[in-house]
């Protein structure tokens, strides 16, 4: 029989769907394993080969864990609200719902063509009313807890998209060429800052990549410092600043406040008022990214006012600059240019004093010295001296002095800011609240609150969403009076904050999730997706999960036990795939040309899963040849028209000892590598085994069966077909993974390297697991080693079991 991958793959995909082969049961007598992909946004451009990498990895794990006796939950769904569908609707007039459904159908078809073993009975769609009613329910709970509130805030406004962007979204949109400005707007805000400490502390218990955890730590930005009061000269009031370095107070030579600070205009003298007003106006048009970029040229304006340094009594000019943000600390800083690079640049530009108060190895004329390892200098007055003290001690003494004098207090602050949750768009979850004429707000009692049909999808020039034009939907009355519904919708992140829970109980109309099912399936054991979501989806989902934990809806503090970030697959030109570069490789095309098993194996064989690697079509052709070798183990005459439909009669006799050992070594290696997501080396080991079988003309049934069982999670279609061809009636997907015998898997004889002072001097063979003293003795008698030990004193003997003996020697001193 010829290896016709197209026919074979369709056959088994149809079989799996028809028989619900990968349905997750609720049997609690099995250990559970929940493996999850970051579910996709169904875009109109479809899936390319880079998208398939993470999905292939999770599918290998899901199939492998099932074969190891686990009850596996491996679901798929669609994160389908979002800007692209709405922008397409604006251009074409097509309802986003229709576009989304079409795109989902295309995505589903591709994923099924890859043979992914999803439990399709659990499929979810964030735009389905049955789903977003519970997203709205969570919002109501947030509101009832005081974690959702309305505020007039300066927001990041995108002119082209006519919508608000969260702080976390700005950088991406600016890179895409959009204009982002700051302007005040009434917004719904979620109080994520109330969970800042827990979000930070609980990172330590997660099995996540350290770089992702560090990105979240940096984004949350916990800092311990002090708020210090500076007397304002001629104003009879104080200006409070936040600093993490009270030990540098003696070096403060000016203060800087944000353009939005409530004292900004009040501190402007008559001579400076016009210039200050103009500066504030211009600063408010800039995005935070523009204002805080380290490379940007520093700008500022002197208010004309002065404050008094509480440590020195010196007058300090008060400036306004856009690099200071109201949202961090107090919106005012003390500037110590000798020991802060931004302050140094500012001082140099505007000719302000620079006073060294931490001993710097190279001085501070050419750059600020920001280290904490040196000691304080020039830091004393008649009441206190911290000269000669290192940072930690100087901090404590200075803080105590300021607190005793009533000049300041210790504070813990966070860079993290509350999450702006409103979007002035149509295609998002309606926010389920009503605004009454008396100013009160009430939540919707009948969920889901659905989107009305609209005639136009464009956001209004006033900043309101298209919902503001739908009067029949917008206005109403009930027992509490006349009301106006909220016209903002939720951001695209809302539905993905809790989707992993809905997969557990997707048909439940009575509650968000059944407690018994939640307790059985949570946490997610393995979550695979891109590192680009470190401070967006992953942080938001952790926040919502902690709220649900406090409400008693979930039983764990964290949603995702282990996170793994797959590396990107680049185009053949070694660049990131994109339409603009013209280097996108559509998934459907390679599936048609090479088949799902070849694509799956090739993407996993490219290199370590976490690494970035380029696509190479020549490589996938090599994988196709490997699959042909596997096929010919069962159909050796597949190229012979007269005999190609005849499967080989496999030999029931035991394997020769050398192949038996090779088989068990292969099972051991593939098991260990699959457990550790080292798929490329597992595939390599199976290739070596196939070559050994071919070279030895092996037709033993046990060898072929064990090969197919090992390969099944990686290449499920060809293995299912060959398993059936050699006489099995039950599908291979229901079979257990092969188990190796440790005694057989170990080599009976091993080669040991001998080093003298780290240099290779010889080798010898020895029985595996030989005692250390035996290995040392044998190593001393290796012919090529003896001469390097003569006249030497052995200082140390280092033995690595079954691998190495190293002698550390020094020349013997003769006795006279």
UniProtKB/Swiss-Prot annotation:
Keywords: Aminoacyl-tRNA synthetase, ATP-binding, Cytoplasm, Ligase, Nucleotide-binding, Protein biosynthesis. One of its GO terms (molecular function) is leucine-tRNA ligase activity. The keyword Protein biosynthesis applies. It holds the Pfam family Anticodon_1. It catalyses: tRNA(Leu) + L-leucine + ATP = L-leucyl-tRNA(Leu) + AMP + diphosphate. It comes from the Bacteria. A motif ('KMSKS' region) lies at residues 576-580. GO terms for cellular component: cytosol. It is an enzyme of class 6 (ligase). ATP binds at residue 579. A motif ('HIGH' region) lies at residues 40-51. The keyword Nucleotide-binding applies. It is found in: Cytoplasm. Its EC number is 6.1.1.4. Belongs to the class-I aminoacyl-tRNA synthetase family. This is Leucine--tRNA ligase.
